[in-house]
Regions:
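Cytoplasmic/organellar membrane-interface segments at the starts of transmembrane helices
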Residues: 315-317, 370-441
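Transmembrane helix-loop-helix hairpins at membrane boundaries of multipass inner-membrane proteins
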Residues: 1-63, 142, 428
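Core segments of transmembrane alpha-helices
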Residues: 40, 340, 400-404
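Hydrophobic alpha-helical membrane-insertion segments
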Residues: 1-2, 118-127, 328, 364, ...
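Short phosphate-coordinating micro-motif centered on Lys-Gly-acidic
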Residues: 89
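Helix-to-loop transition at the C-terminal end of transmembrane segments
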Residues: 2-9, 133-138, 415-420
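Hydrophobic transmembrane alpha-helices and their helix-loop junctions in integral membrane proteins
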Residues: 45-53, 70-82, 95-378
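Transmembrane alpha-helical segments of multi-pass membrane proteins
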Residues: 62-72
């Protein structure tokens, strides 16, 4: 069983792949295990949900989804930089196919935009990994933690990794691929993209930016703060202007990931814990919101907000579950969304009061666009007569959304299992960070 009381990697497996260069080495710690559990929880729900939305080449679609799951698990348990990079980039291929083959009218454009943005962002990371091998003679993450990386090279290496993680997060201003990808992707593709794929970058910031380049992370923290605050405020206002439900949720994802990057670089226990909990919560809530959009799209073939309104009495089960996830997305106390945001802001107030105050404004704007979305879709007058024929959630849809609602509410009232799992690993990471910073290595 996994031991929460130690920070070392557990269940480690190692095999020689290319002698004196690459080892296949995998393992988990308190940070990575939560993302692996999230991946293995969300993917089966995606598989169950596709029975209505995918009409052609269903078996091929399932193959792409399951291959993608394998690559994402590989990312979270990799203990070698080369293995991490291979899994990190290989995950692009099935998502590219999911968008490009089973997506909407502009699927080819969106698929190539997604692929090129994320691939080009990762080229510098490959160069950095090769440089690290040249400098240290190893790409083993555990060995690199122990030996440290020369301070003379940390800034350039940090920027190279940042170029990849910033695009994948995505951070402002390299976020424009995400709304297009979400709009054109099938529902299951949007769920995987928002719930898991974006988390690989947040995980990368914690594992590599803080773990390998502490001196550079300290230097570039003001840059991260600036970009995070812009993402939180700017994309929240953009979300308020959207008429497409998927685009609104996509922009809200950029804002939520802005909180994640802010919390990570506070280098505070509460901040990093909050960022991880926020990523887990966002994985659950964003998956549910995209599934909710998929439900009404399957029935009415429209994602436009003004198509709907006045359906609360027609689809009561849908209205209740949609309300749960809307409130979780805006961070209502008692939902998992509140726990992450609260801890992040606690960490931010300890490190930089002004940044924390500005980021807090995003909470208000977030509540505005989520409540505005819910009000226009669920309440109001029934103008569109076609909505009278709308069918409420079937048993399969109730099951899927309930599976997401239960942990969303449970961790909102009792986040202790999440905190206990990550606490020791984060504490050890911060101690090592401060030790390296004090020694300037």
């Amino acid at each position: 069983l996994f031991d929460q009381t130690i920070s070392e990697f557990q269940f480690v497996e190692q095999r020689i792949w290319i002698k004196d260069f690459i080892n296949y080495k995998v393992g988990v710690d308190g940070i990575s295990i939560l993302f692996i559990l999230l991946t293995t929880f969300i993917t089966p729900l995606c598989v169950i949900s596709i029975n209505n939305s995918i009409k052609e080449s269903l078996s091929e679609f399932l193959i792409a989804v399951l291959i993608m799951e394998s690559f994402m698990i590989g990312v979270f348990c990799s203990l070698d930089l080369v293995i991490f990079y291979l899994f990190f980039e290989a995950g692009l291929i099935p998502m590219f196919l999911i968008i490009g083959i089973w997506g909407g009218a502009r699927r080819v454009y969106s698929a190539f935009k997604f692929f090129l943005y994320t691939l080009l962002g990762s080229v510098l990371m490959l160069v950095a990994i090769i440089s690290i091998y040249w400098l240290n003679g190893t790409t083993d993450i555990v060995e690199l933690y122990e030996s440290g990386i020369d301070i003379k090279y940390q800034n350039l290496l940090w920027l190279a990794f940042f170029s990849s993680f910033a695009v994948k997060t995505p951070m402002w201003p390299v976020h424009t691929w995400l709304p297009d990808a979400h709009v054109e992707a099938p529902t299951a593709g949007s769920v995987l993209l928002a719930a898991i794929l974006l988390k690989m970058a947040g995980y990368g910031f914690i594992r590599f930016s803080l773990g390998l380049f502490p001196v550079a992370s300290e230097i570039f923290t003001p840059l991260i703060y600036t970009l995070s605050v812009i993402a939180i405020i700017f994309t929240s206002f953009i979300a308020l202007m959207q008429e497409d439900m998927k685009k609104l949720i996509a922009y809200s994802s950029v804002a939520h990931m802005g909180y994640v990057t802010l919390g990570i670089f506070t280098i505070q226990q509460q901040g990093i814990e909050g960022s991880i909990i926020q990523m887990i919560s966002h994985g659950l809530v964003s998956a549910a919101l995209f599934l909710c959009v998929g439900v009404v799209y399957d029935r009415m073939h429209s994602r436009l907000i003004n198509t709907y309104g006045g359906i609360v009495s027609i689809v009561p089960k849908y209205s209740i579950l949609f309300m749960v996830f809307t409130l979780a997305a805006l961070g209502l106390p008692g939902t998992s969304g509140f726990v992450g945001e609260f801890l992040i802001l606690m960490g931010a107030f300890k490190d930089n009061f002004l940044v924390a105050v500005i980021a807090s404004i995003g909470v208000i704007i977030g509540a505005a666009y989520m409540l505005w979305l819910y009000k226009r879709v669920i309440f109001g007058k029934l103008i569109n007569n076609d909505l009278k024929q709308m069918i409420d959630l079937n048993k399969s849809e109730v099951f899927i959304l309930s599976c997401l609602a239960v942990p969303t509410l449970f961790f909102g009232f009792y986040p202790e299992p999440l905190i206990n799992t990550i606490e020791v690993s984060i504490s050890d990471l911060i101690d090592e960070y401060n030790f390296r910073l004090a020694g300037r290595l």
